[in-house]
Amino acid sequence: MRTEYCGQLRLSHVGQQVTLCGWVNRRRDLGSLIFIDMRDREGIVQVFFDPDRADALKLASELRNEFCIQVTGTVRARDEKNINRDMATGEIEVLASSLTIINRADVLPLDSNHVNTEEARLKYRYLDLRRPEMAQRLKTRAKITSLVRRFMDDHGFLDIETPMLTKATPEGARDYLVPSRVHKGKFYALPQSPQLFKQLLMMSGFDRYYQIVKCFRDEDLRADRQPEFTQIDVETSFMTAPQVREVMEALVRHLWLEVKGVDLGDFPVMTFAEAERRYGSDKPDLRNPMELTDVADLLKSVEFAVFAGPANDPKGRVAALRVPGGASLTRKQIDEYGNFVKIYGAKGLAYIKVNERAKGLEGINSPVAKFLNAEIIEAILERTGAQDGDMIFFGADNKKIVADAMGALRLKVGKDLGLTDESKWAPLWVIDFPMFEDDGEGGLTAMHHPFTSPKDMTAAELKAAPENAVANAYDMVINGYEVGGGSVRIHNGDMQQTVFGILGINEEEQREKFGFLLDALKYGTPPHAGLAFGLDRLTMLLTGTDNIRDVIAFPKTTAAACLMTEAPSFANPTALAELSIQVVKKAENN
């Protein structure tokens, strides 16, 4: 039906007769001439109808936005004065000789000026996806997956599928359960990741595996989370953690070079402890130059409990954040930041405004200055590198609250004051995570997942001091987003059972949930390691959007609903009966 795409016509096509198929993006009726912008997935071209082709001109008068049409015409060069430098096809236009209206469009439920609520965009997603910027994002996503496949093939990885209907295993979120009609009362689980299957593939001798795969997690959603998402899943045998990172870093550098024309360079490597100490985050945005500075040792003897308490507590921390030029902040802005850190558990926000450092106490403005002598204040200014016109904010509490609150404040202030260089790319690896973290109920939970190997520890040493264990794990972070994470896996049965035991999984439960894995570990398991990238998040970064729903063709809302198809929906009672399922309604609160 077509000979060319609208968006691919150039000066080289001048004089050629072409047939185009697409949609009316815009129509302008000048009486004797009618112009339309005609759109397809490759872009937009200007088509015009003149009186010499009366039948086509008459039919063109009926055109409206989003009519689906076919046009045959001749490509012509535009006059110099009519060239549109903002369009890829702006040097040419098509003189139409014939027009076919394939399908008409009703009055559109979306505003052609693109001022639409996200709810409307999701409900009429098939119309939203016609917008050039949305089409371009999905084309970029397709390019990314193509580049990934070629890279992985070139590096000896095998694309192997793993099951969608599998067994529920604890991986940190709730499973989506699928009832079995054949096995009454039993359920499959949709995979949160192919974790165990890819490890089993290494035990099967496939050495290098990858898969671009759907995963499912029934968890509370955030702006960058979806109940179903896509991973670039990778596993290798006989490779160390640095070797895995080297190959995966090469993949990501390849993507940025091909998609953005940007060489990311070598990725710095930072430990979890250093990231938390300097940036208050295990996924630091290195485009932001500000860092946290520990000052607890300077404040242990002050008669100000807000500082002295955490400063003398082994589990406490007092950290300072120097904000270049921050002395210009108003009282209202400072109060807003004080309220902001309370979201993260902080009780408030102390500060020092540095107006003229050389004047000592007279050169600063601070509500806490009365609790600090000139010597302590000068030591704080010296350590933080404060200059005239700067602001210093303080966080004082337990280590987690200080890291969370001051880390978030660092990001917010950096954005608000334009200190974060948003023209840059700042990738890094974060390594050496704690193996376990407190579950809040006196027990431990795996910081990554229970199949991650500890670093330089025997099973006996791990059992004796699990709180000291460092995971042989690594995350890739770009511009403050965790885009991928992985680890060296446990390849020894004793170690795996030790980890299960530390997590409170008794032997009976181990056999019930992981018997197949424990059995497989008995038969010459190779050392193996892997990683998974979030394809949605990678695409989000590479297309410059901050909304993950913009890079998924048919995403869910934050309530895990599809507004277009109205999923989820109630099941047919007959289907439920066949599955031996009865829906029990919760009693309404009186």
From Swiss-Prot:
It catalyses: tRNA(Asp) + L-aspartate + ATP = L-aspartyl-tRNA(Asp) + AMP + diphosphate. Its EC number is 6.1.1.12. Its main location: cytoplasm. Residues 195-198 are annotated as: Aspartate. HAMAP family: Asp_tRNA_synth_type1 (MF_00044). Catalyzes the attachment of L-aspartate to tRNA(Asp) in a two-step reaction: L-aspartate is first activated by ATP to form Asp-AMP and then transferred to the acceptor end of tRNA(Asp). This is Aspartate--tRNA ligase. GO terms for cellular component: cytoplasm. The lineage of its organism: Bacteria, Pseudomonadati, Pseudomonadota, Gammaproteobacteria, Enterobacterales. It is found in: Cytoplasm. It comes from Escherichia coli O1:K1 / APEC.
